Each structure stands twice: as structure tokens, then as C-alpha cells.
């Protein structure tokens, strides 16, 4: 009787043990998601601060009489260190959380850049004018924060370790091979229209960037996951797939940066940021869902809420970048022969080059063959000026003597 009673007790205790194991596994998966999300948010925030620090360093040197190069300043090196730290955090986040969660969190860098840009404004605004000018940025930041919260809350849970066997199995699976075939065909078509037909539309260029970026993030997750497992004691560096993924990661990142550079030469950076974020995030999530099977086993409600979070984050980023205005470039070197009324200034002995209280050091005046046929060379004061000198001469050049040729 005692033996049968104890066996019955053991049978009754088995179901709670299995359910508690499932609950602990889900809790551990959620903790890994949270660690990855926090690392990604921290990384994007630090990268945004680093970029603004380096930009501040360049602006400060351009507006002062400091002859030092930017790489000789502590501010620029601090920005470089923070950038490397932030990129390391983003890279490590892929080892803990699903790709579908980490990729949309790049909206954090857009939010941080908008806030930092407002804080570092030097002009004084009345509250009414300030709100009118930056209302879209505030609304966009709010929407992006709400979207980020939904992404973290309803993201798919990571259940699989990035071992060499798992990565190889995903790489040769027929869904991913079919996806790769479609992506290669689409990439070749877009590249043909871009190079041969001069299709310089921003959507074409950023689609090329997004297709390359999807492969970059897929390989980054594999490389980061295998490195973390190796650090934890489960060595994965002896698998050839690790080096295949590493080479693909570097190659796609380099070509992605090249296309982004070409896009920045033709379009405004705010437009590139908004359109590029939407396209890259959408294609990267699709690639992650196919390669790593991120949404397998997830219920419909979680998938719909995750998609809603993506849409809200897209709208927030669009509003933030929509509020930015194009910067008007300033050209320090002026072509004097293109200025109307130049001959009258010579005749009246007026100042040829006005005094400019700025850091830009003007070079010699440009020669004009048409004017030299009428006027003899002007006699200028004996002064020497070198490009990049510590300060520009405060004494304006004046025409001392001229004679007309008969």
C-alpha cells in the first residue's frame, strides 16, 4: 500500500514539474530579450552622443582660431571611444535577443539625435515659436517611444543558441534558400537600373542598402551569438560557418556604406534617415523571420501588437526627420571676378575684400584674364598669408595703383 501510495504521489507531482520548467524557460527567454534590448538601446544612445560630440568638435574648431587638427582634440577622441563602445553594445545585443527585436530599436538613435539637437541650440526662442518649430519632433519622439515599448513587450522570445550546427541548418533550409534567390534577383535588377538606366530614385538606392543590410544583420547575429557562446566556454570558432558569416558580414557592411554614401550626395540626410529606417527595418525583420524562425510558435495577438509597434515607430521617425531643415552650405572662398561692379571698386580705390571676423583664412584673389587686359597688376601691401594659418589678416586688401592700357 505504501509503495502504491508513493507512486501515485510521484505521478501527481510530474505535471507541475513540467509546467514549472516551461515557465522558467519562458522567463529565462524574456530575460535574454530584456538584456538584448537594453544593450541595443544603450548602444544606439551612446553612438548618437558620440556622433554629436564629434560634430561639436568640428564646429568648435571651425569657429575658433585654434590651428589644431580635429584628431588632436580630446573631444574628438572621446567621441570615437563612445562610438566604439556603442557599436560594441549593439553588436552584443544580437547575441541575446531576436533579430526582429534589435533591428527596430535603431529608432532610439533618431530620438536621441533630435533631443540632443534641441538641447545644443544656441538661439533663443520664445515658447510659442519653439513649440511651433519643434512640435513635430516632440510628437515624433513620443510615438517612437511608444513604438519601442510595444516592440520590447511583444517581441518574439529567443529559444535557440547560435551554435555552428544551428546556423548551418538554418543556412541550408529551403525557406532561406528561396528567400536568398528572390533577394539576389531583386538586387541584380535594382543594380542594373541604378547603374545602366541612371535610376537615381532614393527608393532604388535605399532598397539596395536595405537588401544588403538584411544580410548584414543576419550574419551579425550568427557571429555575435557564436562569439558569446565561445566566451562562455562552448567553443564555436572551429566551425567553418563562423568565418563564412564573418566574411559576409564585413563585405555587405562595406557595400552598404558605399551605397549610403552615394545616396547622401544626392538627397537630404533627413529623407535618407526616414526612408532608410522604414525599408531596412522591414526587410531585416523579414529576413530574420525566415532565417531564424523568430515568429514560430507566437500567437496572433503578439504578432499583431509587434507589427503595430513597428508602424508607430516608423511614424515617429518620419515625423522627427520631417521637422529637420536642410543646412545651407557656406562657401568661404569667394570668386571676386564673379562679383558685379568689380571694376568700379577698382576705379574708386574701394576695399576689394571686406574684413571677415571668422576663422576662415582667405587665399589669394583669383585672376581674371578679361580684367587683366584692361588693368595693370595692382600694387598690394607686402604681406604674406598661408592657407590654414592661425588667423586671417584683419587688414583688407586695397588697390593702391592702377593704370589703364591704351
Curated annotation (Swiss-Prot):
Coiled-coil regions listed: none
Modified residues (Phosphoserine): 372
Compartment(s): Membrane
Glycan attachment positions: 166
Ribosomal protein in keyword set: no
Transmembrane parts of this sequence: 33-53, 76-96, 101-121, 135-155, 171-191, 202-222, 240-260, 271-291, 300-320
InterPro entries: Mg_trans_NIPA
Protein name: NIPA-like protein 3
Species, as recorded: Pongo abelii
Lineage: Eukaryota, Metazoa, Chordata, Craniata, Vertebrata
Amino acid at each position: 500500500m505504501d509503495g502504491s501510495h508513493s507512486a501515485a504521489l510521484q505521478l501527481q507531482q510530474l505535471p507541475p514539474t513540467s509546467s514549472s520548467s516551461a515557465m522558467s524557460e519562458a522567463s529565462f527567454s524574456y530575460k535574454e530579450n530584456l538584456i538584448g534590448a537594453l544593450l541595443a538601446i544603450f548602444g544606439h544612445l551612446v553612438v548618437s552622443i558620440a556622433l554629436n560630440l564629434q560634430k561639436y568638435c568640428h564646429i568648435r574648431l571651425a569657429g575658433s582660431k585654434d590651428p589644431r587638427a580635429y584628431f588632436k582634440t580630446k573631444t574628438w577622441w572621446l567621441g570615437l571611444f563612445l562610438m566604439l563602445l556603442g557599436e560594441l553594445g549593439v553588436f552584443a545585443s544580437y547575441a541575446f535577443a531576436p533579430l526582429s527585436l534589435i533591428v527596430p530599436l535603431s529608432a532610439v538613435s533618431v530620438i536621441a539625435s533630435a533631443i540632443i539637437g534641441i538641447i545644443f541650440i544656441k538661439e533663443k526662442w520664445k515658447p510659442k515659436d519653439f513649440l511651433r518649430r519643434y512640435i513635430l519632433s516632440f510628437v515624433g519622439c513620443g510615438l517612437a517611444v511608444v513604438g519601442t515599448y510595444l516592440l520590447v513587450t511583444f517581441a518574439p522570445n529567443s529559444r535557440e543558441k547560435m551554435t555552428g550546427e544551428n546556423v548551418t541548418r538554418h543556412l541550408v533550409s529551403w525557406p532561406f534558400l528561396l528567400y536568398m534567390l528572390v533577394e539576389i534577383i531583386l538586387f541584380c535588377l535594382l543594380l542594373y537600373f541604378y547603374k545602366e538606366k541612371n535610376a537615381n530614385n532614393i527608393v532604388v538606392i535605399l532598397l539596395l542598402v536595405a537588401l544588403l543590410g538584411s544580410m548584414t544583420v543576419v550574419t551579425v547575429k550568427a557571429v555575435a551569438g557564436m562569439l558569446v557562446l565561445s566566451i562562455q566556454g562552448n567553443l564555436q570558432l572551429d566551425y567553418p560557418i563562423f568565418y563564412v558569416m564573418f566574411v559576409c558580414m564585413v563585405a555587405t557592411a562595406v557595400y552598404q556604406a558605399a551605397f549610403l554614401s552615394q545616396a547622401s550626395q544626392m538627397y537630404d540626410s533627413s529623407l535618407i534617415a526616414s526612408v532608410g529606417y522604414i525599408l531596412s527595418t522591414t526587410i531585416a525583420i523579414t529576413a530574420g523571420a525566415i532565417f531564424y524562425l523568430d515568429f514560430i510558435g507566437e500567437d496572433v495577438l503578439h504578432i499583431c501588437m509587434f507589427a503595430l509597434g513597428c508602424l508607430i515607430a516608423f511614424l515617429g521617425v518620419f515625423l522627427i526627420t520631417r521637422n529637420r531643415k536642410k543646412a545651407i552650405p557656406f562657401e568661404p572662398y569667394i570668386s571676386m571676378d564673379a562679383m558685379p561692379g568689380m571694376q568700379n571698386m577698382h576705379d574708386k580705390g574701394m576695399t576689394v575684400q571686406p574684413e571677415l571676423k571668422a576663422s576662415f583664412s582667405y587665399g589669394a584673389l583669383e585672376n581674371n584674364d578679361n580684367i587683366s587686359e584692361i588693368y595693370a597688376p595692382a600694387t598690394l601691401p607686402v604681406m604674406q598669408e598661408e592657407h590654414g594659418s592661425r588667423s586671417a589678416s584683419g587688414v583688407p586688401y586695397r588697390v593702391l595703383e592702377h593704370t589703364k592700357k591704351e
